[in-house]
Regions:
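Short beta-strand elements
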Residues: 675-691
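Glycoside hydrolase catalytic-domain context in secreted enzymes
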Residues: 1-673, 690-691
């Protein structure tokens, strides 16, 4: 038996044995994302590129969950874990079938390039909805849960997760191939590297993807500083470049002068897999003396180690018998529905919700996102075998008459190319006039907030120019509101949106997945209570934001600003009335009693800490949370552990340690700011502690 087939040896030993049998040409070929077969050694071809940030993506039918920003809005890491576990189950089911048929194409492997744990620091960033929001702690908690769900706890990895994009990456999309993110040591440690360190140390993430941009002058995929951080944290997985990022070294960053030099620079820094085609020049780099054979083989060992950890060279694994029938099965769709319900955020309710079906005979469902599948999907999405749009969900749940009108194009001034501008406004006005209540479904989709290079992008390479709806939708809202009927606005978007016009209720639905229509209907009609919380700050205007290209955290996110706020981070209403009635702290644990004076509801108890020292963030920061269910009139005891790291802060030179001795802890259903208290009608409790 060849040593690389000997399952009693470690993955490292087996990988070294396998690579020792390769020629240098064969080893170099394995560093491409589309690695060819090495038939004489029995190594099948393997494509490293697969996606799965909210369900398996781009590989045909799969369960479609809410976009990642919606998963963060649940404030429920157990459910985030379950989403990832289902995603990896479906990935294995597909891999088992595809491998039998020798189909080893892109999006069919076991290395999932997820999660995206970049910090959504600026609401204009088009890819922000792929992330878990603006807070490092929440991002890390969701990210760790997702990694553990993807990788499993078996003898071999169920799938291999990949933390991306390392690091300091959050727009602007239009300049990402040439941009240099300049960031100080404090912001690096406190904000941009926090989640990556947590995923490496505590979740043992198998992969890390480098970003397109430079960080303080160094290309992220060849950064001595960033690679040094991974070594310090004990990372022993594989490192992959973002797709065609190494080409940027010589075409945009101008740190090398040729593809050969770029390939050499990336390899020597520690980039194992090139998503792109620059590593076809590695043998030329070897001939020129720019890299060594040992460096090529070392990278190949890292990659074979991951494949061995996935069980690819074992006789069998515990996942081989996962059947194809699990893909998009009813049980998985039920979890998608549960996520959609828990992710949606009720931002405003003037007493209209939940709607009483018995008092209404006709509902008008209006808007470009009312019957839109794209409004459910986000990006990096799979294909659902059944979509329930907002319109379909409301029609299924309501026995009376539903009048539908598209109202307007998502962003163009007309729906029909042959018509005059505003060609669908009259229909929307008529539907509103002939109804008892209006449900107006507006927002965005991935064509107007997304990634640079996506074929469907219409504006600003995926970024948003401002925080308002497109003009076509603003005019629609104004016209429908003039009719004077009660109006509920449902906004499908992955980021901060200022609706501007008044309404009777406002629900931010994110991109809620294939079950989004059922979820919105059940919330509107009161079958369930909304309970999502904002994982990002909603701002009034983009005009008052710092410069998009400025990566300093001052005046950004809830930790550093209280200006220009429309709806605060952590805010979200329910149909209940959950209040904290007592608070105590002992031995690293916070104990609270909560009471619900309203309807049965889920809610989130949020814990914030303020360190009393000069280098602490300006405002209290999230350091714990727990999702609860409380019946009407019920009291509940809740315990939240305060992590040791919560008592540390970061100095101006990037040193993290406990500087303060005195702290204030705040507990409530939102953060302890005046606006959250005003909007929710409840206060937080606080306690002073020493440590």
């Amino acid at each position: 038996m060849k040593n690389y087939l000997n399952e009693s040896l470690s993955a490292q030993e087996r990988a070294e044995a396998l690579v020792n049998e390769m020629t240098v040409e064969e080893a170099a070929s394995q560093l491409r994302y589309d690695a060819p077969a090495v038939e004489r050694l029995g190594i099948p071809a393997y494509n490293w590129w697969n996606e799965g940030i909210h369900g398996l993506a781009r590989s045909g039918v799969a369960t479609m969950f809410p976009q990642a920003i919606g998963l963060a809005a649940m404030f429920d890491t157990d459910l985030v874990f379950k989403v990832a576990d289902i995603t990896s189950t479906e990935a294995r089911a597909k891999y088992n079938e595809y491998s039998k048929r020798d189909d080893r194409d892109i999006y069919k492997g076991l290395t999932l390039w997820a999660p995206n744990i970049n910090i959504f620091r600026d609401p204009r960033w088009g890819r922000g909805h792929e992330t878990y929001g603006e807070d490092p702690y929440l991002t890390a908690e969701c990210g760790k849960a997702y990694v553990k769900g993807l990788q499993g706890s078996g003898k071999v990895l169920k799938t291999a997760a990949c933390a991306k994009h390392f690091a300091v990456h959050s727009g602007p999309e239009a300049v990402r191939h040439e941009f240099n993110a300049e960031v100080n040591w404090k912001d690096l440690e406190e904000t941009y590297l926090y989640a990556f360190e947590e995923l490496v140390k505590k979740a043992k993430v198998e992969g890390v993807m480098g970003a397109y941009n430079r960080v303080n002058g160094e290309p992220s995929c060849a950064s001595e500083f960033l690679m040094g951080k991974l070594d310090k944290w004990g990372f022993d997985g594989y490192f992959v470049s973002d797709c065609w990022a190494i080409r940027d070294f010589h075409e945009h960053h101008m740190v090398t002068s040729s593809p050969v030099e770029s390939a050499a620079m990336a390899l020597k820094a520690g980039c194992n897999v090139n998503c792109g085609c620059t590593y076809v020049h590695l043998l030329s780099a070897l001939d020129k003396g720019l890299v060594t054979e040992d460096e090529i083989r070392a990278s190949c060992v890292a990659l074979m180690r991951t494949r061995i950890r996935l069980g690819m060279f074992d006789k069998s694994t515990e996942y081989d018998n996962i059947p194809y029938s699990v893909v998009s099965c009813p049980e998985h769709k039920a979890v998608s529905y549960q996520c959609a319900v828990k992710s949606m955020v009720l931002l405003k309710n003037k007493g209209i919700l939940p709607l009483d079906k018995k008092s209404i005979s006709t509902i008008a469902v209006i808007g470009p996102n009312a019957d839109s599948r794209a409004a459910l999907e986000g990006n990096y999405n799979g294909t659902a075998d059944r979509y329930v749009t907002f319109l379909e969900g409301i029609e299924d749940a309501f026995e009376g008459r539903v009048l539908y009108a598209e109202g307007c194009h998502l962003y163009k001034d007309r729906v029909s190319g042959l018509a005059q501008a505003g060609d669908r406004y009259a229909e929307a006005e008529a539907a509103a006039a002939n109804s008892d209540v209006v449900i107006l479904c507006v927002g965005l989709d991935a064509t107007i907030e997304g990634e640079e290079g996506d074929t469907g992008n219409e504006f600003s390479s995926g970024d948003k120019n401002d925080l308002r709806l497109p003009e076509s939708q603003r005019e629609l809202i104004k016209r429908v509101a003039k009719i004077g009927k009660p109006m509920i606005v449902v906004c499908a978007a992955g980021s901060s949106i200022n609706i501007e016009h008044d309404c009777d209720a406002l629900i931010h639905a994110w991109y809620p997945g294939s079950e989004g229509g059922k979820a919105i209907a059940d919330i509107i009609f009161g079958k369930v209570s909304p309970s999502g919380k904002l994982p990002v700050t909603f701002y009034n205007s983009a005009d008052k934001l710092p410069c998009f290209t400025d990566y300093a955290m001052s005046d950004r996110t809830y930790r550093y600003t209280r200006d220009n706020i429309l709806y605060p981070f952590g805010y979200g209403l329910t149909y209940g009335d959950v209040v904290v009635t007592s608070l105590s702290y002992d031995d690293g644990k916070v104990n609270v009693e909560v009471e619900n004076n309203g309807a049965d509801t889920c809610d989130v108890i949020e814990l914030y800490i303020k360190s009393h020292c000069d280098n602490a963030p300006v405002y209290p920061v999230l350091c714990g949370f727990k999702r609860i269910f409380v019946k009407k009139g019920e009291k509940l005891d809740v315990e939240i552990e305060v992590p040791d790291k919560a008592f540390t802060t970061v100095s101006d030179i990037g040193e993290r340690k406990q500087f303060a001795k005195e702290f204030t802890l705040y507990v409530g259903t939102h953060q302890p700011d005046e606006l959250s208290c005003q909007l929710s009608g409840t206060n937080c409790m606080s306690i002073e502690i020493e440590r």
